[in-house]
Amino acid sequence: MTSWAKPGQAVYLRENLSGETVQVGAFDPSLPGTANRMKSLPEGFTKLGIPALLRCAHLDTLWVTVDEVGYLESGMEGYQQAFRTLLENKQVAAVVRKQPLAFLQELCSRKDAFVVDLDDPFGKIGCVIMASGLGRRFGSNKLLADFGGEPMICRILDATEGIFRRRVVVTRHEEIARLCREREISVVLHSLPNRNDTVRLGLQGMEEMDRCLFAPADQPLLRRETVAALALVSKGSPYCWRLSCEGVPGSPVVFPEWTFEQLKNLPEGKGGGILLKKYPERLRTVNIRDGYELQD
């Protein structure tokens, strides 16, 4: 289902499978305000909107898309009931207007609803990229090794681009620091020996964040879409979140704000994993299809 407006004229609704289209709203200059002065046309919802939703509820398909649900639909009780029937029978991806209307708030507050605010999809999430390894197994600094024509470190920089309110790379290596500065990414350059030092240093400046993702810098096959999924599901959540593939856990890991103080005071040589073991009931996973994303 798709609806759209012609400003100053009308609103239309189309059933995408059949292509049938009806008018469901008409411009009314007598309405208050300067925009969206549309009044509902109940006959359009009765002719197509309600029957189309009920047909979709019984299609041989898992997903149904509805773009969009707004104030016109909020005044149509029959359409609302048909939408509830659809939700009971299908998984629905819907665009819902951000307006203080009862039906729209009902949809977004359902226990089975996963809501993404398109104006602020990821929220106040920080990112710490841990790039302090000494490369003993590799024999040299593997983060500077060529991977697809660029230093390996660049892969995690790309995978975390454009998602986080604050992003910082914690490293012992001047060359990595230089690469990050060239890309205008914040860097903490240090000479401290332990993993807990990296975690503590990374959390500096994250006071305004409500959660923080910690990502190893040596997972070059990690995709940006996967990082974004972690950021999305963790928004507004009190849980720790990590990736998993076929029951095998992996990184990155998102830690909520209530863990920050404990992360800053980890035992010497320990990382955030100690908290995941301490609070197993507060851990959730995002399952991914391709285990290669977790490989270092």
Short names for language-model regions:
Residues 261-296:
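Conserved alpha/beta core of the MobA/IspD/sugar-nucleotide pyrophosphorylase nucleotidyltransferase superfamily
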Residues 154-213, 225:
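Conserved N-terminal catalytic core of the sugar/cofactor nucleotidyltransferase
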Residues 33-69, 73-75, 203, 224, ...:
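Internal catalytic-core helix/loop-beta-alpha segment
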Residues 193-261:
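Conserved beta-loop-beta/alpha segment of the NTase-like Rossmann-fold superfamily
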Residues 4, 98, 150, 171-175:
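Residues in the short beta-alpha loop(s) of Rossmann-like NAD(P)-binding domains
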Residues 1-37:
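N-terminal phosphate/diphosphate-binding loop that engages ATP/GTP or pyrophosphate donors
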Residues 125-172:
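N-terminal glycine-rich phosphate-binding loop and ensuing alpha1 helix
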